[in-house]
Amino acid sequence: MSDSVPNYLFVKEEVSLREYKMYKYLHNMELPFIPKLYRYDKTTRKLDMQRIIGMSVADFYGEAFDCVPKKIISEIRNIIRYLYNIGVVYPDITGYNFIVDKNSKVWIIDFEHCFYINNLQNKNDIIFDKFDNNIPDKDEHINFVVNFSFNNENN
């Protein structure tokens, strides 16, 4: 790819194969809150994906949870809950990993720390087996995600 990047493209550098596989897995499901995936180069570890025109939640509203509108928090919870229900645990819930576009749609990015829960995994889908069996603090991450997405509906 040349130095000039088309305006529809975002190039993320230093992407692990594990993170790429998670992006690819979710991209193939055509989820409306995941940017489109175009290409991954295993040699350079660059991931080419859809550029979302907008700002991160943290940049737009600030880093304090209380400053983020309840509607945005609810959308983030819905995304995290949906991912959990399909077996993906996304513990890196920070305002910098969610983008609000010009239409106020919330997008999720950065799957470096997420992992697949093997007990929910389709037995024919072994893409994550060797990557997600030894996640440090796995149970704590799962509990955090469950508490955030299922137990905090009023705030």
What are these model-predicted stretches?
Residues 85, 101-155:
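C-lobe/activation-segment region of protein kinase-like
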Residues 85-95, 100:
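Catalytic-loop of the protein kinase fold
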Residues 33-73:
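Conserved structural core of kinase catalytic domains
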Residues 1-25:
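ATP-binding glycine-rich loop module of kinase domains
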Residues 53, 95, 113:
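Short, glycine/acidic-enriched loop or turn micro-motifs at the edges of active sites
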